[in-house]
């Protein structure tokens, strides 16, 4: 089944990004629509795919990871974090494939890629 999934690894503490809020948006032309809002589980993953099946369509998407709130809870970073919301915009061109968007994050940096 085709679907979109994500996974967050906190490379600052060496643990999954437990409790991070993630919002998913879909762009129809220039109109941005929120598809879902989830909280990552103990493994830093959503309990369900972010989107799947007939709701999974070609186009431009955006994931917003609320990492500033997460790091404020687990570290002594300043009140104004260096990274607050990490926004990843990406395209889905083949709805027959599984798309996985992992995020490796610290209070000062992040990296992403198309996973499997």
Features from the language model and the residues they span:
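Compositionally biased low-complexity segments at domain edges in trafficked proteins
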Residues: 95-116
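Beta-strand-dominated extracellular/periplasmic modules and repeats
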Residues: 1-89, 100
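Short beta-strand edge segments in extracellular beta-sheet folds
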Residues: 91-93
């Amino acid at each position: 089944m085709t679907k979109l999934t994500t996974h967050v690894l906190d490379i600052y503490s060496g643990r999954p990004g437990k409790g991070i809020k993630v919002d998913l948006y879909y762009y129809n032309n220039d109109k941005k629509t929120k598809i879902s809002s989830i909280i990552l589980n103990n493994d830093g993953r959503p309990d369900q795919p972010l989107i799947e099946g007939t709701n999974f369509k070609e186009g431009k998407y955006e994931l917003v990871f609320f990492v500033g709130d997460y790091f404020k809870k687990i570290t002594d970073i300043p009140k104004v974090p260096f990274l607050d919301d990490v926004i990843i915009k990406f395209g889905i061109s083949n709805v027959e494939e599984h798309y996985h968007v992992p995020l490796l994050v610290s209070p000062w940096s992040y990296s992403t890629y198309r996973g499997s």
